[in-house]
Design a protein with these regions (language model features):
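Cytoplasmic-entry segments and transmembrane alpha-helices of multi-pass inner-membrane transporters
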Residues: 9, 82-121, 284
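Transmembrane alpha-helix signature in integral membrane proteins
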Residues: 59-89
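Transmembrane alpha-helices
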Residues: 158-159, 181-217
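Interhelical loop and adjacent transmembrane-helix boundary motif
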Residues: 215-263
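Short membrane-interfacial helix/loop motifs at transmembrane-helix boundaries
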Residues: 27-58, 223-230
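Amphipathic cytosolic juxtamembrane alpha-helices at the membrane-cytosol interface
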Residues: 5, 95-100, 168, 172-199
Length: 284
């Protein structure tokens, strides 16, 4: 029995080490290949430059940084509110006979490939936006709407689990104080699940900022500063995918450096939310 436990501990340790090693190797590859390129180009020119012309050895990724932030921010604003309300409905309002149907539909959304979402956006959302704005439908707003739909399953899944895990005593105590069902849900249960909701939002941000295929199909892909939500743009992930296939030399290194910037962005978001979570816990 002890031998079996020792073997299982060793297996778990190896699995954990493999996971950590994979992340470490990715970090080493990115920073070894990307950071030197940033210093070759010049950190200020690379991060704040507004012109991307690889043919002229001009590599300014500020338009792609702004594009990624704007698209992700709009998607989160639109998607998170819908996701939280959906989670509340599923966990506290949805009749049992409809729960399975609703949950299956959301799970199905999570399994749809990005290319299918992109095709849907290209065929349905882009023409609709073109009619509404009188411009090309490949815009920031179009990409944000599609990303908001794409992050729903991720945020709903985590948020619903967080709301469901809140002890029933919170809800019952609120009812005992004279609150209605809705007041108890929104002012007692949901606030108690805020840590899980924040985790869901972080996962949603990660999904949105890292999405590539669907964004390439509908965002316009112009490497220039976006001037409004009805203008086209290019994100950092789209920039890497569109040009990595034929890039070489400093151009290729600049694309890897773009990946470094994206990695740092994700890291900063995770650290920020982690610190916010600690404040929430200390506040409780």
């Amino acid at each position: 029995m002890k031998l079996r436990e020792t073997i299982m501990k060793l297996v778990f340790l190896i699995a954990a080490c493999c996971s950590v090693l994979a992340v470490a190797l990715i970090c080493i590859f990115l920073f070894m290949n990307g950071v030197p390129a940033i210093f070759k180009i010049g950190p200020l020119k690379f991060l704040t430059g507004t012109v991307w012309k690889p043919g002229n050895n001009i590599f300014g990724i500020l338009p792609m940084i702004v594009g990624s932030i704007c698209v992700t921010g709009l998607a989160i604003l639109m998607g998170v509110s819908v996701a939280i309300l959906t989670s509340v409905f599923l966990s506290r309002y949805c009749p049992k006979k409809f729960y399975g149907i609703c949950k299956s539909g959301i799970n199905l959304m999570a399994g749809i490939p990005s290319i299918v979402y992109g095709f849907f956006g290209l065929v349905v959302i882009v023409p609709l936006m073109a009619q509404l704005t009188g411009k090309n439908g490949n815009t920031m707003l179009t990409a944000s709407i599609l990303l908001a739909v794409m992050i729903l399953p991720t945020v709903v899944g985590v948020t619903e689990s967080a709301i469901t895990s809140v002890p029933e005593s919170y809800y019952e105590a609120s009812l005992g104080l004279g609150a209605t069902h809705s007041q108890s849900v929104f002012f007692a249960v949901v606030p108690a699940a805020k840590s899980g909701i924040l985790a869901g939002i972080v996962l949603g941000i990660g999904r949105a900022i890292g999405e590539t295929m669907a964004v390439i199909m509908i965002a316009g892909n112009q490497p220039r500063m976006p001037k409004g939500i009805t203008e086209g743009l290019r994100t950092m992930t789209a920039n890497i995918v569109l040009e990595m296939g034929y890039a070489s030399g400093l151009h290729r290194e600049a694309l890897i450096a773009t990946g470094v910037v994206l990695f740092v962005f994700i890291l900063l978001i995770n650290l920020s939310v982690s610190m916010l979570n600690r404040r929430v816990h200390y506040g409780d």
